[in-house]
């Protein structure tokens, strides 16, 4: 067999390397062992196993060094050599009995009268510690002991049980047990009983229990105790009685070892409780005694009771009631109910748990079985009352029935009930739990509320045009973090307060199983348009819009019709505002709308086409069809409005009406002379020719259209233009389409509302009422409406305010949703366009239409390099707040037809804010273009001017290396950039520091001449290098 190492042997013997090394070094081995890697021969391994596996006997030497201190020392007794291990085991019981008698005799002389009432059955006796196999705990547990207390047995039962079953039962050792050990049973003797006798009732003992116990114990010490005469108050006696009933019950009772461990200290205290029921304060002390270390208890249990009796006098127990010494006599009272006879295990009462039977132990061969708990001996009513008082105390001892109830309660608290989802909401009776004392019922604690899916009708929510993330999460009943996570999955970076548009909210709600509906304010109900009865309708004047290209004579034509001079008041001779006029002709009234012809006023032309009945398209006979002419044609066709073409400037030389007809026919306007349906009228606004024919055609077309309206109802119309008048506040030019607007009516106009305080016509004359197709200026609105907003008269101002606030909220939420919606794609684009410059503008204009035209025209100028951002736009003069905003946002203020006050001008100068004033939109657009070009970076183009070859180098102190060169191509100029090439590779790129020919500085050197050149901050010039000279040409950007 191969040699074994120390660590392998330690693994076989189930011990650590260090412990085995210590044991090996203590043994006299032929070969010294130094570490766990040392090798051992076969004979050494056998010797070590024989010495270590065979347990050594121990004896405990005790010496009392004080009234309460006992010193114990273990004395190892080497077993006889050559004795086999198997033969030593049967002798252990007898050897233990002898050592128990010796140890008991040593402790007889120790006076410990006070310790007599201690719960002797709780602690282990000393003879167990003096067993021969006490060196190793596991070997000691397997060794049988003559008499063991209940707590120690309960701790060792799980290990004792298998060994006790495996070993053959040795002969009974009842006679071997000395009388001194039996004297430890402190209780009154009873007549002999069978295995489960029913004892007679016993009267409670007087308070001086310790003295009586001492007398009984002394009496028992003088005479050998018989097993059948042992009282039932001792738990060990009960265990013996149970074991005598039959050995087959022993394995069934072994699994209850842990229950005995908890219950044995309580059961052992039951009889003393009955004898002294008047001391409830000692229960806690008894529990402390039960938890004391085991080393102190054997000495108490071994002391002979006869020796303790003389040391105690009658008044002593009363004087020492408050100390821990007498706690064992005051734990619990004896039960008064009669004990039921022992029944089979299938009956209601469970058999008392027993300690496992082993050689020399309770219930084993040689020792009568000991019952687990004392029998019910009855008691007086006072004892019953005291028992009821202390029934619920944890630290007090209880009867077997009380113990079982306590453990059942404990188990019931740990029990977990499975509650179905439907039971959580089931409020039917019968789900209540009674209290500890049978009081009022307590409701069972419900589990956490489960998340349930609402019904389909509840999974439908209504939202406005936009909703915040937090509000949507609240509506859906989920956390906002879940919504944000889903938004990130959709590529949208959102916060809790960010606004979401309707479409995004629909997608999010669908993921959580909800349907979304638009919760529009019931404007349709409040502002419902009523259909007019035919008998209430009457003819109304036509609304005619004059459209055409710029400088084709639209306003001049209208002036000729109105016999006014509007053109003279226009800046630059062009119309920049939309105007509404009511003209009286011999055949009736006509409402005219004059629109600007400049390309910037597209929105104005579109608005005019929407509210008009007939469009007069003015085309100059000498100029023909222009881009804005085509645009006006498209607007009119989109609105479904008939067009009358007025060929103007027929008095000028070069007028060609046929050319106009040809070009317009290409756009779908075929004249009547050519078989079409478009009316062409040749006029001259300057000479006032053809005006009557034009008005006649307009009225004829109106008759064909049968224009009618109901004047006897609340007015409805559209805002043609709006502005802020310094003295009158917000002023809106409106065109009434149906109904009649009176002064004092409450109106809603876009997001604003108000009461009409005054009305004026185009000549600034006050009006009391404005009927259908009548333009008017109204005052009294809460703000400046947008051009094109619908104006509606209502009955109640409260309704108007409600509609206005709802519209304002919806508009604000929509703007927030657009501005704050940041997606991953947009973020990437912004990162890519990090070098894009922004030109911030603040637009202040006289009317809303001009602002609209300026904003659209300027934002079209944005390019890839410069973005135009309109920070703020409003009507009215430049205010201090505008200057402050411009200073913060680094913006330029564009003032169109407005002027600031001197105070504002001074503030702008202090804040270094640039204010630009314009009265013609052309100039504003051109200057903004120049500003954009100035912000754009120029490009540079490289031009090679010449090449020179280095033929020699010179080093000049404080100057550096000078290259003597020969110009081979082109010419060399002083301001050129130079590039040094060596073998075709660029070595350096910089500037010329000097250029000389001989000793003279020169500006340039032509081809075929030699010169000296110095390169700035570079001296590594070698013969054979080539110097390439070039210059950069700046190419300024051009705005497309």
UniProtKB/Swiss-Prot annotation:
Renumbered residue ranges of the record's region G3: 594-597
GO terms, molecular function: GTP binding; GTPase activity; translation initiation factor activity
Positions of region (G1): 548-555
InterPro entries: EF-G-like_DII, EFTu-like_2, IF2_II, IF2_N, P-loop_NTPase, Small_GTP-bd, T_Tr_GTP-bd_dom, TF_IF2_bacterial-like
G5: region residues: 684-686
Subcellular localization(s) per the UniProt record: Cytoplasm
GO cellular component term, pick one: cytosol
Binding site for GTP: 548-555, 594-598, 648-651
Biased composition (Low complexity): 142-153
Segments of this protein annotated with the region G2: 573-577
Bias (Basic residues) ranges: 430-439
Coiled-coil residues: none
Region ranges (G4): 648-651
Comp. bias (Basic and acidic residues): 112-126, 198-214, 231-300, 394-403
Keyword terms: Cytoplasm, GTP-binding, Initiation factor, Nucleotide-binding, Protein biosynthesis
A Pfam match: EF-G_D2
Signal peptide: none
Sequence ranges of Polar residues compositional bias: 444-454
Major location (coarse): cytoplasm
Chain residue ranges for the region called Disordered: 73-403, 427-456
Residues of the tr-type G domain: 539-706
Protein family according to the UniProt entry: Belongs to the TRAFAC class translation factor GTPase superfamily. Classic translation factor GTPase family. IF-2 subfamily.
Function: One of the essential components for the initiation of protein synthesis. Protects formylmethionyl-tRNA from spontaneous hydrolysis and promotes its binding to the 30S ribosomal subunits. Also involved in the hydrolysis of GTP during the formation of the 70S ribosomal complex.
PANTHER family: TR-TYPE G DOMAIN-CONTAINING PROTEIN (PTHR43381:SF5), TRANSLATION INITIATION FACTOR IF-2-RELATED (PTHR43381)
Protein name: Translation initiation factor IF-2
Lineage, uppermost ranks: Bacteria, Pseudomonadati, Thermodesulfobacteriota, Desulfobacteria, Desulfobacterales
């Amino acid at each position: 067999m191969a040699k074994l190492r120390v660590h392998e042997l330690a693994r076989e013997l189930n011990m650590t390397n260090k412990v085995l090394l210590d044991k090996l070094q203590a043994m006299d081995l032929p070969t010294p062992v130094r570490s766990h890697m040392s090798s051992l021969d076969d004979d050494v391994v056998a010797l070590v196993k024989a010495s270590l596996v065979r347990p050594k006997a121990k004896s405990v030497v005790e010496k009392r060094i004080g009234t309460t201190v006992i010193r114990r020392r273990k004395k190892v007794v080497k077993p006889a050599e050559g004795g086999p291990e198997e033969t030593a085991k049967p002798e252990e019981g007898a050897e233990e009995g002898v050592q128990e008698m010796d140890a008991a005799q040593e402790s007889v002389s120790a006076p410990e009268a006070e310790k007599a009432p201690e719960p002797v059955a709780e602690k282990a006796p000393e003879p167990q510690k003096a067993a021969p196999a006490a060196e190793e705990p596991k070997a000691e547990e397997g060794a049988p002991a003559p008499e063991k207390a209940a707590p120690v047995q309960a701790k060792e039962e799980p290990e004792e049980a298998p060994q006790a079953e495996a070993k053959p039962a040795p002969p009974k050792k009842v006679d071997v047990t000395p009388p001194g050990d039996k004297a430890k049973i402190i209780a009154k003797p009873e007549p002999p009983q069978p295995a489960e006798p029913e004892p007679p009732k016993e009267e409670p003992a007087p308070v001086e229990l310790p003295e009586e116990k001492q007398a009984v114990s002394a009496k028992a010490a003088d005479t050998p105790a018989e097993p059948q005469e042992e009282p039932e108050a001792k738990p060990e006696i009960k265990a013996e009685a149970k074991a005598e009933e039959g050995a087959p019950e022993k394995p069934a009772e072994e699994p209850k070892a842990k229950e005995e461990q908890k219950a044995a200290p309580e059961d052992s205290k039951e009889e003393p409780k009955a004898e002294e029921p008047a001391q409830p304060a000692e229960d806690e002390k008894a529990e402390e005694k039960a938890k004391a270390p085991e080393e102190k208890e054997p000495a108490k249990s071994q002391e002979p009771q006869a020796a303790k009796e003389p040391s105690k006098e009658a008044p002593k127990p009363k004087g020492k009631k408050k100390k821990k010494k007498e706690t064992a006599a005051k734990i619990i009272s004896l039960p008064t109910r009669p004990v039921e006879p022992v029944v089979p295990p299938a009956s209601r009462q469970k058999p008392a748990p027993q300690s496992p039977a082993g050689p020399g132990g309770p219930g084993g061969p040689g020792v009568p079985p000991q019952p687990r708990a004392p029998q019910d001996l009855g008691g007086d009513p006072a004892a019953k009352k005291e028992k009821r008082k202390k029934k619920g105390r944890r630290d007090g001892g209880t009867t077997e029935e009380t113990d079982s109830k306590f453990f059942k309660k404990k188990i019931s608290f740990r029990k977990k009930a499975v509650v179905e989802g439907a039971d959580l909401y089931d409020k039917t009776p019968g789900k209540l739990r009674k209290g500890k004392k049978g009081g009022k019922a307590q409701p069972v604690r419900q589990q956490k509320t489960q998340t349930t899916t609402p019904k389909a009708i509840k999974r439908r929510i209504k939202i406005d045009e936009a909703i915040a993330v937090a509000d949507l999460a609240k509506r859906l009943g989920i956390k906002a973090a879940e919504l944000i996570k889903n938004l990130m999955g959709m590529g949208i970076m959102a916060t809790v307060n960010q606004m979401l548009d309707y479409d995004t909210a629909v997608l999010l709600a669908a993921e959580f199983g909800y349907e979304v509906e638009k919760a529009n304010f019931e404007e349709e109900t409040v502002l419902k348009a009523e259909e007019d009865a035919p008998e209430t309708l009457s003819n109304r004047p036509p609304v005619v819009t004059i459209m055409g290209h710029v400088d084709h004579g639209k306003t001049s034509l209208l002036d000729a019709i109105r016999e006014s001079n509007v053109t003279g008041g226009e800046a630059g001779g062009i119309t920049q505002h939309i105007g509404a006029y009511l003209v009286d002709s011999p055949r009736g009234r006509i409402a005219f709308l004059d629109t600007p012809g400049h390309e910037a006023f597209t929105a104005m032309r579109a608005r005019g086409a929407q509210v008009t009945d007939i469009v007069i398209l003015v085309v100059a006979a000498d100029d023909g069809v222009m881009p804005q002419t085509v645009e006006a044609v498209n607007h009119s066709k989109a609105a479904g409005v008939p067009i009358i073409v007025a060929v103007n400037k027929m008095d000028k030389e070069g007028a060609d009406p046929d050319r106009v007809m040809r070009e317009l026919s290409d756009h779908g306007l075929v004249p009547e002379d050519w078989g079409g349906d478009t009316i062409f009228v040749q006029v001259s606004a300057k000479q006032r020719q053809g005006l009557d024919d034009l008005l006649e055609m307009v009225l004829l077309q109106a008759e064909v259209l049968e224009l009618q309206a109901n004047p006897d109802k609340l007015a409805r119309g559209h805002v043609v233009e709006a502005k802020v008048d310094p003295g009158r506040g917000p002023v809106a030019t409106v065109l009434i389409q149906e109904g009649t607007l009176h002064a004092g009516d409450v109106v809603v106009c876009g997001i604003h509302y108000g009461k009409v305080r005054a009305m004026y016509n185009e000549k600034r004359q006050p009006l009391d009422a404005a009927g259908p197709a009548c333009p008017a200026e109204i005052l009294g609105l809460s703000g400046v409406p947008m051009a094109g907003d619908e104006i509606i008269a209502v009955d109640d101002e409260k309704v108007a305010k409600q509609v206005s606030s709802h519209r304002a909220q919806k508009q604000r939420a929509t703007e927030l949703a657009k501005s704050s919606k940041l997606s991953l794609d947009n973020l990437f684009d912004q990162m890519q366009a990090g070098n894009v410059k922004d030109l911030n503008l603040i637009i202040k204009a006289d009317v809303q239409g001009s602002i609209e035209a300026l904003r659209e025209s300027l934002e079209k100028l944005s390019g890839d390099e410069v973005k135009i951002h309109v920070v703020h736009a409003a009507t009215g003069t430049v205010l201090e707040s505008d200057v402050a905003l411009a200073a913060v946002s680094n913006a330029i203020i564009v003032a169109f037809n407005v002027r600031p006050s001197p105070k504002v001008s001074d503030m702008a100068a202090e804040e270094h804010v640039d204010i630009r004033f314009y009265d013609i939109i052309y100039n504003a657009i051109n200057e903004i273009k120049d500003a954009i070009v100035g912000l754009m970076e120029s490009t540079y183009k490289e031009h090679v001017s010449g090449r020179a070859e280095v033929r020699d180098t010179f080093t000049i102190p404080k100057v550096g290396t000078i290259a003597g060169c020969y110009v081979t191509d082109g010419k060399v100029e002083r301001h050129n950039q130079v590039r040094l090439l060596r073998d075709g590779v660029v070595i350096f790129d910089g500037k010329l520091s000097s250029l000389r020919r001989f000793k003279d500085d020169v500006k340039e050197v032509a081809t075929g001449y030699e010169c000296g050149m110095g390169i700035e901050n570079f001296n590594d010039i070698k013969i054979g290098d080539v110097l390439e000279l070039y210059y950069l040409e700046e190419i300024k950007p051009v705005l497309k």
